[in-house]
Amino acid sequence: MAASAAAANVKIRIVSPGHALFAAVMIWLGVMGLSKGTFVQVWQPVPKWVPAREALAYLCAFISLASGIGLLWQRSAAVAARVIVASLMVWLLVMRLPNLFYETPLVLVAWSFGSTAVMAGAAWVLYVWFAGDRDRRRLGFVADERGVRVAQVLYGLSLIPFGLAHFMYLDATTVLIPHWLPWPAGWAYFTGATFIAAGLAVTFGLFARLAAALSTLQIGLFSVIVWVPRVLAGPLNDFQWGEFVVTWALTAGAWVVADSYRGTPWLAGRVTRDSEGRSAA
């Protein structure tokens, strides 16, 4: 009996493909950070005023690795998700938010903010899924369906600068489009417009499930069509590896947020949720 109870406490728990991918990416980020001793792309740029940069880089890598592993185990999943949410929200507020007011160009600063916000939103969704009754009593909206809605809005707002960057940095966008696709500028404009439309839809809760799913598909296709061939073609430098992993991190984060709409009609204008933050028709 005791052995069975112990086994139950350590069993793996994966609630969705997005959850599994997000955990895997966090582990990957941790391994990269610990092996290099530097901030991987998901944490960059880091302001020059930050002290003890090397120690902080190792701390970020350790949090990523330990929390990624923790997300896969039933007993530790809630704690792991809470640690990721807390660390990413601190990073968002301390390292990203101030830059919106004095750094330029604004769209690139907002892009960095959005990348961190996507991952924070995904971790927040996972935390609500795994949170127990005690967490809901103690933390209120952070651990209930209101927290999921905040996470979804974070994701929606993040998509808007992703789209704007396609228009403002057209040349940098078109060089990433595979040569076998015709009209690269057209694809750049199209994907930029769809990011903006999806961001507005998710933010305002209009056709949000469809918008979240399609934006996840778009980010995932970018990972597969743009980066996988580059990995297969030859060795990447550290920056390119970082960009490759960040793209998969955004794919994983988007997938988790899209999963939070499960059960909602695809064309629903408004969303209701159960006590665990999962959408319900």
Regions found by a protein language model. Give the residues of each.
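Extended, low-polarity transmembrane helix blocks
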Residues: 1-38, 54-66, 70-168, 187-193, ...
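Membrane-interface interhelical connector segments
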Residues: 36-49, 140, 168-186
